[in-house]
Amino acid sequence: MTTLAIDIGGTKLAAALIGADGQIRDRRELPTPASQTPQALRDALSALVSPLQAHAQRVAIASTGIIRDGSLLALNPHNLGGLLHFPLVKTLEQLTNLPTIAINDAQAAAWAEYQALDGDITDMVFITVSTGVGGGVVSGGKLRTGPGGLAGHIGHTLADPHGPVCGCGRTGCVEAIASGRGIATAAQGELAGANAKTIFTRAGQGDEQAQQLIHRSARTLARLIADIKATTDCQCVVVGGSVGLAEGYLALVETYLAQEPAAFHVDLLAAHYRHDAGLLGAALLAQGEIL
């Protein structure tokens, strides 16, 4: 059975056909609409899936935000242009006339990345560092989403009580500091207004402020990982996302994690499926029908 998998992120929308063998075909992308209106997202999703839906038997959505009863509830509305709520399952069922499931994108990615690990591992945490910071927890070989869909939203744990206000309403969240948006927001002077990709490029060229911003992000993530180890005693942490997979970033995180006491050390791995983990995880979960 072929699944039409959709990944809704803060920067882009992606869709692909995924067969029972896990192979990705006909992958497509569109920019995420920067609009507070649900119609803008509906229109973008319609354009994205219309060329693919005739070739699928079901739809699986991986989306940023809390997924509860098939709807997207934005924990940080800034990640979707200010959109607070969107009926994901209902909308895609209307657009495609296909049975549809939805799950948080980082939770979906965690499940895909778990499948790629050594068979002896039963407990892992996935972290995505991109527009925001998200996560997914696999414990005892099972994906943990929580009764309200909040499990794994580790980007909204505290990093600095005196830090910037996060879009979720808390002060000093990991996401507000370590994410691509957090890196860009903290930039000053000639880097003011630059996005995270530009800041990484400038860091590679020796720009001191850019390097400091990236080190600040990596240090914050390392402290988060130490907290995760203390909370879950996971066997490994897998890091993905556009920032997490940027050249040299994971090595920086490893350097800062090594400065923590040994009890909080844990193996760090780069995401095996890289930017396709959300799509694959959603399809795998649909195939397993465990949601």
Swiss-Prot record:
SUPFAM superfamilies, alphabetized: Actin-like ATPase domain
Binding site for Zn(2+): 156, 166, 168, 173
UniProt binding sites for ATP: 5-12, 132-139
Keywords for this protein: ATP-binding, Carbohydrate metabolism, Kinase, Metal-binding, Nucleotide-binding, Transferase, Zinc
GO MF annotation list: ATP binding; N-acylmannosamine kinase activity; zinc ion binding
Catalytic activity: an N-acyl-D-mannosamine + ATP = an N-acyl-D-mannosamine 6-phosphate + ADP + H(+)
EC number(s) reported in the record: 2.7.1.60
Gene Ontology biological-process annotations: N-acetylneuraminate catabolic process
Pathway note: Amino-sugar metabolism; N-acetylneuraminate degradation; D-fructose 6-phosphate from N-acetylneuraminate: step 2/5
InterPro entries linked to this entry: ATPase_NBD, ManNAc_kinase_bac, ROK, ROK_cs
Kinase as UniProt keyword: yes
Superkingdom: Bacteria
Subunit structure: Homodimer.
Entry's family note: Belongs to the ROK (NagC/XylR) family. NanK subfamily.
Entry function: Catalyzes the phosphorylation of N-acetylmannosamine (ManNAc) to ManNAc-6-P.
Record's protein name: N-acetylmannosamine kinase
Gene of this entry: nanK1
